[in-house]
Amino acid sequence: MAANYWESTQRKHWLFTKDELAAMRAKLEAEEPNLVASFPLPQLRHLNIYFNQQINRLGKRMGLRQQALATAQVYIKRFYTKVEIRRTNPHHVLVTALYLACKMEECPQHIRLMANEARGFWPTDFQSQTEVARIGECEFYLISEMSSHLIVHSPYRTLTSLQGELGLAQEDVNLAWSVINDHYMTDLPLLHPPHVIALTAILLALVLRQDPSGRLPGTAASASGLVAASAALAQAQAQAQARAAMMAGGGQTVPGLTPQSSSGLQAMLPPQSPAGEGPAEGNKNPRMAKVHRFAAWLSDSNIDIEAMVDCTQELISFYECHEQYNDKNTREQINRFVKARGLDK
């Protein structure tokens, strides 16, 4: 993996705005209006959930590393910004993406083993006479559509590297890791840098762990925590902009602070004690003290708070959407166009 994200093809070629993504997808559908009309599909988030679940099933069966599963999902997202999904067999694409990701993440799998395992899940899509050739052909197709940009930087590295610096407990890291896993079912890998996603996951982990139940994101009990995190960041950003405007008007500057980093995230912190000794309830609530330390760390950095707000809101929206996911319906709609168009042959 390339050491420098800032010079990577991921940053230069595979980060988009939401409007750009929407325009690319609309263009693909406009090129195939009859196909789109004939085979309606679930919303994209539900398709991403389905792909995630299928890749995780196959990866678990084969004992693959999480990094390879994550990279495969990024490949699928990139590929489907270039190719209309109804022109492909998604099962071929996801198996091939995983096969290619294993190569890139230094845990290669033999193509015949991958084909045999895939046949166990999708016997009609992977017939013994053609399955290996099919994966080989699809591999070149993926590489071509991605312009050979195969190195993917993930948020996991940022999370593990900051564990000591931020004083994160292993439970914090585990929950943040789960949030990062979940973000691959959204468009966030195509919208924001991995370090922003990692820091958002840390924030959500710290906020959610204040719930003594320790529930993971996506449950009803955790929804309020996610909303609180989003509101805190939004309020902090507004405070930062107001403070920056006042400093600009008075000709004052504060070294190391930008409109994004000057927020201090005070909205999510407990009240300060009059003596300036830190959080008034710090000794009683160590979880809030940890949130305070993380906020102070962010205030001293140049992290884009607006991007963290967007990441948080996207995750909230995703968790709400996940509750309406219907696996049977999604699977049937995919199989319908695959069989009707003979893409399972």
Swiss-Prot record:
Keywords for the protein's UniProt record, in alphabetical order: Activator, Cyclin, Nucleus, Repressor, Transcription, Transcription regulation
Record's subcellular location: Nucleus
Pfam family, one: Cyclin_N
BP GO terms, sorted: positive regulation of transcription by RNA polymerase II
Keyword Repressor: yes
Residue segments, region Disordered: 256-285
GO molecular function: cyclin-dependent protein serine/threonine kinase regulator activity
SUPFAM superfamilies linked to this entry: Cyclin-like (SSF47954)
Superkingdom field: Eukaryota
GO cellular component: mediator complex; nucleus
Cyclin N-terminal domain ranges (all copies): 53-144
Subunit structure comment from the entry: Component of the srb8-11 complex, a regulatory module of the Mediator complex.
Function as written in the Swiss-Prot or TrEMBL entry: Component of the srb8-11 complex. The srb8-11 complex is a regulatory module of the Mediator complex which is itself involved in regulation of basal and activated RNA polymerase II-dependent transcription. The srb8-11 complex may be involved in the transcriptional repression of a subset of genes regulated by Mediator. It may inhibit the association of the Mediator complex with RNA polymerase II to form the holoenzyme complex. The srb8-11 complex phosphorylates the C-terminal domain (CTD) of the largest subunit of RNA polymerase II.
Family: Belongs to the cyclin family. Cyclin C subfamily.
Protein name: RNA polymerase II holoenzyme cyclin-like subunit
UniProt lineage: Eukaryota, Fungi, Dikarya, Ascomycota, Pezizomycotina
